[in-house]
Curated annotation (Swiss-Prot):
<dbReference type="InterPro" id="IPR011332">
    <property type="entry name" value="Ribosomal_zn-bd"/>
</dbReference>
<protein>
    <recommendedName>
        <fullName>Large ribosomal subunit protein bL32</fullName>
    </recommendedName>
</protein>
<dbReference type="Pfam" id="PF01783">
    <property type="entry name" value="Ribosomal_L32p"/>
</dbReference>
<dbReference type="InterPro" id="IPR002677">
    <property type="entry name" value="Ribosomal_bL32"/>
</dbReference>
<dbReference type="GO" id="GO:0015934">
    <property type="term" value="C:large ribosomal subunit"/>
</dbReference>
<keyword id="KW-0689">Ribosomal protein</keyword>
<keyword id="KW-0687">Ribonucleoprotein</keyword>
<dbReference type="GO" id="GO:0003735">
    <property type="term" value="F:structural constituent of ribosome"/>
</dbReference>
<dbReference type="GO" id="GO:0006412">
    <property type="term" value="P:translation"/>
</dbReference>
<dbReference type="InterPro" id="IPR044957">
    <property type="entry name" value="Ribosomal_bL32_bact"/>
</dbReference>
<feature type="compositionally biased region" description="Basic residues">
    <location>
        <begin position="1"/>
        <end position="16"/>
    </location>
</feature>
<feature type="region of interest" description="Disordered">
    <location>
        <begin position="1"/>
        <end position="60"/>
    </location>
</feature>
<feature type="compositionally biased region" description="Basic and acidic residues">
    <location>
        <begin position="17"/>
        <end position="44"/>
    </location>
</feature>
<comment type="similarity">
    <text>Belongs to the bacterial ribosomal protein bL32 family.</text>
</comment>
Length: 60
């Protein structure tokens, strides 16, 4: 069975665990509709992405 040669310091343990935290997703307000959407994603309500119509507009 493998055994560590040295004890892991609290600093090194913390640096290893620093990437484990969950991050809250970021949202940007759409300029045209005012809806919140993810950056670099299309707006599903209007179907627009970077000023172009990508998909048909969703009718409510």
């Amino acid at each position: 069975m493998a055994v560590p040669r040295r004890k892991t310091s609290p600093s090194r343990r913390g640096m290893r665990r620093s990437a484990d935290a969950l991050k809250r997703p970021t949202y940007a307000e759409d300029k045209d509709s005012g809806e919140l959407r993810r950056p670099h994603h299309l707006d599903l309500k209007t179907g627009m992405y970077k000023g172009r119509q990508v998909i048909k507009k969703k009718d409510a």
